[in-house]
Regions:
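A short, N-terminal "cap"/entry segment at the start of jelly-roll beta-barrel domains
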Residues: 1-35, 50, 120-142
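Conserved short histidine dyad/triad with adjacent acidic residue
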Residues: 23-24, 39-54
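Short, charged/polar surface micro-motifs in flexible loops or helix N-caps
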Residues: 30-34, 44-48, 67-69, 111-115
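A short hydrophobic beta-strand segment most commonly corresponding to one strand
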Residues: 38-41, 86, 101-116
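A generic "binding-loop/recognition-motif" signal
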Residues: 47, 56-57, 75, 91-92, ...
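Short beta-strand His + acidic residue motifs that chelate non-heme Fe in jelly-roll/DSBH
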Residues: 50-52, 70-71, 87, 93-99
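Glycine- and acidic-residue-biased ligand/ion/polar-headgroup-sensing regions
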Residues: 56-58, 62-68
Length: 142
């Protein structure tokens, strides 16, 4: 546990997937905050992830840049910079980048936990802090 008040991107490992990159800037291990986790998600153009749920965590997505399509339960909406999406625990959802530039999101889980599930997926590759999130920089532990 830490009590860090300021975190920079180079301080944090990256989770690399074929659809994009995640950097969890606030987790219990990084900042010591126990009630939520938060990070930046970058989805590459035309990429997205399959519908999934977080059985024990609510999720908030805030669109920083880009445009995409967000599914929540049986509703699908176009999203763009400035939009916010609330996904209650256990509700199936998915995100797709429909634009030509990366879709940049700020994601929050409350309580924390789904970020650890993502890290443990076989398709998740870990890039150490301070390294560009590219396949060449993946660590052996992935």
């Amino acid at each position: 546990m830490s009590d860090r008040h300021f975190v920079e991107p180079d301080d944090i490992e990256s989770q690399l997937f074929d659809w994009g990159v995640l950097k969890w800037m606030s987790t219990p291990e990084v900042t010591g905050g126990e009630r939520f986790s938060a990070g930046v998600v970058k989805l590459e153009p035309g990429k997205g992830h399959e519908r999934h749920t977080h059985p024990e965590s609510d999720e908030i997505l805030f669109v920083i840049r880009g445009e995409g399509e967000q599914e929540v339960a049986d509703e699908t909406r176009d999203i763009t910079a400035g939009d916010m999406v609330f996904i209650p625990e256990g509700v199936e959802h998915g995100t797709l980048n429909t634009g030509w530039e990366p879709l940049l999101l700020f994601a929050v889980y409350a309580p924390p936990g789904p970020e650890d599930v993502l890290r443990d997926l076989p398709e998740c590759e870990i890039v150490p802090p301070g390294k560009l999130p590219t396949p060449e920089n993946v660590t052996e532990e992935s």
